[in-house]
């Protein structure tokens, strides 16, 4: 049963089977406001999870609620959910504005309110000047943006976004990411599926990692990585005199390995240190510099090398899990 006054997105022991084929199994999640990214290869359960959330399929077992609303109440659910699919399908002959007005009519908006909301949505995705053109004449990136406008035009509290950055040029991509962050900061729930893992790293407040229908990890990427104590941390140090620094740090009990790196695209050489404790490495480098143990040492940057979504996923499921 759904708890009275329940908020958030909740999956309780949810399984979905398509005949004998597993979609997802025994999923227990509470998704908070902000940007949550689903990570996993094709067939891992991402699409099933989004379809369950949108009420497009029903669980075989368990219960899903969205802001306290079960999918068995689609009229209520669709008022709070917007879904941006990756499918390039529109009403024949419709302009961008007509597409949005039709969507808003389905949500029960009066014509005057629908006109205002459609215009606002076009402006948010930078399509105001193209709103009255036929969608069939839009570029791939413009069609992606009108799908996004369709998902947000009725001001939903929950947005389900399937590959929402696909086909966008760099400027439109940056503008769309900024819009997502604005919506997340304002308290909306954004659930995003993306195969571009560096974008997942850049925009996500938390991730849900799936493999073969199971949730294998959830939370902030850095927090998930920090819990994986069986895998020593990899830290990349761009610096002058990397050979001398490697020789100086390798004697520390928390340092397991130090490998000199070739210069990067900006010409900075460096080293990659394998350590049980990144904070101990940072403290050791500070101590070495203060004591001038490596004369002429200049640190350009220090950054973790394996606490991104791709690395964490591979640690969790191994190479057999495939790409996300």
Summary of predicted features, one role per range:
Residues 177-274:
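ABC transporter nucleotide-binding domain
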Residues 54:
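Helix-to-loop junction immediately C-terminal to a conserved catalytic motif
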């Amino acid at each position: 049963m759904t708890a009275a006054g329940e908020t958030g997105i909740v999956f309780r022991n949810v399984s979905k089977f398509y005949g004998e084929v597993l979609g997802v199994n025994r999923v227990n999640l509470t998704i908070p406001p902000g940007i949550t990214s689903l990570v996993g290869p094709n067939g891992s359960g991402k699409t099933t999870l989004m379809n369950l959330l949108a009420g497009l399929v029903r669980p075989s077992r368990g219960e899903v609620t969205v802001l306290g609303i079960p999918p068995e109440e689609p009229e209520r659910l669709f008022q709070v959910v917007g879904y941006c699919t990756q499918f390039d399908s529109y009403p024949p002959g419709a302009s961008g504005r007509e597409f949005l007005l039709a969507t808003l009519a389905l949500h029960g908006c009066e014509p005057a309110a629908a006109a205002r909301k459609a215009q606002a949505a076009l402006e948010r995705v930078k399509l105001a000047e193209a709103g009255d053109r036929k969608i069939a004449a839009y570029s791939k990136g413009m069609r992606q943006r009108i799908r996004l406008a369709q998902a947000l035009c009725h001001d939903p509290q929950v947005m389900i976004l399937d590959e929402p950055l696909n086909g966008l040029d760099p400027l439109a991509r940056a503008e769309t990411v900024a819009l997502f962050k604005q919506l997340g900061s304002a308290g909306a729930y954004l659930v995003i599926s993306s195969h571009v893992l560096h974008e997942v790293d850049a925009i996500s407040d938390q991730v849900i990692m799936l493999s073969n229908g199971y949730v294998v990890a959830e939370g902030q990427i850095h927090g998930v990585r920090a819990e994986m104590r069986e895998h020593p941390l990899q830290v990349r140090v761009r610096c002058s005199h990397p050979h001398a620094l490697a020789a100086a740090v390798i004697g520390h009990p928390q340092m397991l390995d130090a490998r000199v790196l070739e210069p990067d695209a900006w010409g900075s050489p460096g080293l990659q240190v394998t350590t049980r404790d990144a904070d101990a490495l940072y403290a050791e480098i500070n101590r070495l510099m203060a004591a001038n143990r490596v004369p002429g040492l200049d640190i350009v940057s220090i950054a973790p090398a394996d606490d991104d979504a791709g690395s964490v996923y591979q640690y969790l499921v191994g190479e057999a899990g495939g790409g996300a």
